[in-house]
């Protein structure tokens, strides 16, 4: 749980922004969304595998695009 100490004479919106940023860095909202509903382990693995495949395809596309620009 992120802890924010409000500095003296610090506006509330600035402190709130710092708190939101620290929550984002800690990954709290992503964790809450992930735990909102149960996901079967097979579905979770399938989703993770699909995202890995997509990442790999993106990486290959970037490398191919870079190669074509070199010539």
From Swiss-Prot:
Comp. bias intervals (Basic and acidic residues): 60-71
UniProt keyword Manganese, yes or no: no
Keyword Zinc listed: no
Family label: Belongs to the bacterial ribosomal protein bS21 family.
Protein name in UniProt: Small ribosomal subunit protein bS21
GO cellular component, one term: ribosome
Region (Disordered): 38-71
A single BP term in Gene Ontology: translation
GO molecular function: structural constituent of ribosome
A Pfam entry, by short name: Ribosomal_S21
Transmembrane segments: none
PANTHER family: MITOCHONDRIAL 28S RIBOSOMAL PROTEIN S21, SMALL RIBOSOMAL SUBUNIT PROTEIN BS21
Keyword field: Ribonucleoprotein, Ribosomal protein
Biased composition (Basic residues): 46-59
